[in-house]
Amino acid sequence: MEYRTNNVPVGNETKSAALNALPKIKISDSPNRHHNLVDAFMQSPSYSTQPKSAVEPLGLSFSPGYISPSSQSPHHGPVRSPSSRKPLPASPSRTRDHSLRVPVSGHSYSADEKPRERRKVIGNYVLGKTIGAGSMGKVKVAHHLKTGEQFAIKIVTRLHPDITKAKAAASAEATKAAQSEKNKEIRTVREAALSTLLRHPYICEARDVYITNSHYYMVFEFVDGGQMLDYIISHGKLKEKQARKFVRQIGSALSYLHQNSVVHRDLKIENILISKTGDIKIIDFGLSNLYRRQSRLRTFCGSLYFAAPELLNAQPYIGPEVDVWSFGIVLYVLVCGKVPFDDQNMSALHAKIKKGTVEYPSYLSSDCKGLLSRMLVTDPLKRATLEEVLNHPWMIRNYEGPPASFAPERSPITLPLDPEIIREMNGFDFGPPEKIVRELTKVISSEAYQSLAKTGFYSGPNSADKKKSFFEFRIRHAAHDIENPILPSLSMNTDIYDAFHPLISIYYLVSERRVYEKGGNWNRIAKTPVSSVPSSPVQPTSYNRTLPPMPEVVAYKGDEESPRVSRNTSLARRKPLPDTESHSPSPSATSSIKKNPSSIFRRFSSRRKQNKSSTSTLQISAPLETSQSPPTPRTKPSHKPPVSYKNKLVTQSAIGRSTSVREGRYAGISSQMDSLNMDSTGPSASNMANAPPSVRNNRVLNPRGASLGHGRMSTSTTNRQKQILNETMGNPVDKNSTSPSKSTDKLDPIKPVFLKGLFSVSTTSTKSTESIQRDLIRVMGMLDIEYKEIKGGYACLYKPQGIRTPTKSTSVHTRRKPSYGSNSTTDSYGSVPDTVPLDDNGESPASNLAFEIYIVKVPILSLRGVSFHRISGNSWQYKTLASRILNELKL
């Protein structure tokens, strides 16, 4: 359901009737906690002082800072009141908006009624092209209306309680589906709450969160370097020196998360992006949760290739040890170019992971092998802690010490607690503010906390205590295992600033965010106790920063029955979006990569091995729209220019489990291309694929013109905003642009690439653009890749005949069906039965790969390069296919 602007005035009678129609259920008394998310939010103190708009059939409310529907702009959706907030500065490095807003949602158009505009505006953000689609939702590129800055907006569909009730009453199968959707929404709320609190140089930063009656909109910073996966595609493997830089940054981010009682639980190559500066950014906290050292988490989730053995064995876990295993898999992939455990048969793959036997290539250094052998240990009690990993000799080689966690300086929390901070500690299932105060006071008053607070013990990342030898950590770890064979060493609380308690961690994070918003230095914000009540009243903000509260339950339970794990090879809990479809492979289609079916990080051919790689490779390309366009009275342009190359943003993995997309099925390529919203008047991709080579070779790329943003921009604010809108929404800005259906002898201008270390030898060439283009068309035809011409390259669709054949196993621990109806399974801080089937990253044989290939120009060197961008589909099939294309291109 697309977001549309509501321009219809609403009377008081309509408001009253609609509001009275909402169910009024107290959170503590409701057996169905999910149904109270919207009601509880509307009844919150910060919301009740504002007028309420009419509630549409799916429920509707709007928060402070947004004017009434009758006075909204007809083209720009919800408009912020001029007096509600200070203008956003041009550079967002200092101030950002962390509040969760509920802007006015659009009304549903009748069959005869058509919208005036296709522009979609959420707050101050103009939504543009879809650059990633998955089972969780989609990611769109967006521009800020005032500053023109680019952002990534993650859009997650939500369900209304009435719809959920209707499904639950239909059948037992529908009840399971409804329960799955409830759990999904609660995880989304938790992700939104976490994303707005975390602030680390190697974690993708969230700027805003909006909710409507049908969607969550999470606004993230724009990461313009592409996926780490594309880095691996170009290089095959990295030198240890180069891998060490990335690994230290990943370790720094994990250290920050773990110190704040957060476990990621879905760390993998697809969830690591690379910025233009060459630094990594970790994304996707959809499966993250808070952990407590004395409790156990019982949600078995993640991606199979990166999942720890205890998850496959359905064993409760604390949290950080799961991230350490995934961290080890990521390190292995970086230095070896493939995963350590792989098999075509699903049961055999499970057995390999549980056994944990790893083969190390001979070219790895002894230190690197030693580190991997400590991380990839099947027994979590014997596995290295993150502290040990960060102090390993391989990790600190050529550096002064272990990577810093960038955790700010903190002081012990003292009573009384700040009520403003307490009110913002929502979204984590802590309960109402009264309960949070009661529980937090109990923790602060405990003997353990007071004892550590008095001693002033602090083992910060830069302190002398942390700079000890690797062998000291090994000895201490082993001794503790002997003394406490049941609990690993990370279960001891020896630092009140290092994951002492989830309530403590979130209190710190909220306090630090508040200081940061006021202009403080976030790395030095806690020199005074953070809990003292301010002497002067806090100035009220003009927006609602209250997240929808999580359901009220008794938390901190860790002895419940473990949930089952799905036998499905994807996250079946995610319902496919209505605008995300796929089609079965054609019987005539042949898979040219079937020879290497399960190779997900295969080494490249011997020809590529002989080539020397340059420093690094990043992937950039124009985004591809995946949502179906609503009917519009306007005539569609003959083509849609992609946004600027700077718009290359959070990849498809940013919107959920990157390879767990359960898509529908199509009849053919035309439907697929329509669903990807690639409008063109030229011949269809299927026709071109079947056309004679002479015809295909005559197809040329479209002129890019001014749509890429490389031309001179007008100094007028009006013209500037108009250009931003045209660029974002794909409207043509150059009337003289050549139609895609035209074939000319002159090649179109090629997108220049300025990212550091973008390409390797295997992805660049001194060949002319025409030659590379002809080779691309030849290779795509040879590999049965259906393609359609877009600006600067091709939008491609590959229908594999079978990459992986999942087989059922009789093993007790083999991916059992999740028990959606059970209420006895919970994480220590997840009241939801947070049962998430493990994603094995192996889509069904009928799953399709949607991706883009661009011909780009490498500046200064007068070289041409090929850039890939995955839209949807299995990451590892994509990696194998991209490697095959590069091999056949013979650049």
Swiss-Prot record:
Transmembrane segments: none annotated. Keywords: ATP-binding, Cytoplasm, Kinase, Nucleotide-binding, Phosphoprotein, Serine/threonine-protein kinase, Transferase. It is found in: Cytoplasm. Residues 842-891 form the KA1 domain. Its main location: cytoplasm. Residues 529-538, 583-603 have a biased composition (Low complexity). The active site is at residue 266. The keyword Nucleotide-binding applies. One of its GO terms (molecular function) is protein serine/threonine kinase activity. The modification Phosphothreonine is found at residue 528. Residues 612-629, 649-659, 669-699, 728-742, 820-829 have a biased composition (Polar residues). SMART domains: S_TKc (SM00220). Its EC number is 2.7.11.1. It is an enzyme of class 2 (transferase). Pfam families: KA1, Pkinase. GO terms for biological process: cell growth mode switching, monopolar to bipolar; establishment or maintenance of actin cytoskeleton polarity; establishment or maintenance of cell polarity; mitotic cytokinesis, division site positioning; plasma membrane organization; positive regulation of mitotic cytokinesis, division site positioning. The modification Phosphoserine is found at residues 535-536. Signal peptide: none annotated. This is Protein kinase kin1. The lineage of its organism: Eukaryota, Fungi, Dikarya, Ascomycota, Taphrinomycotina. The gene is kin1.
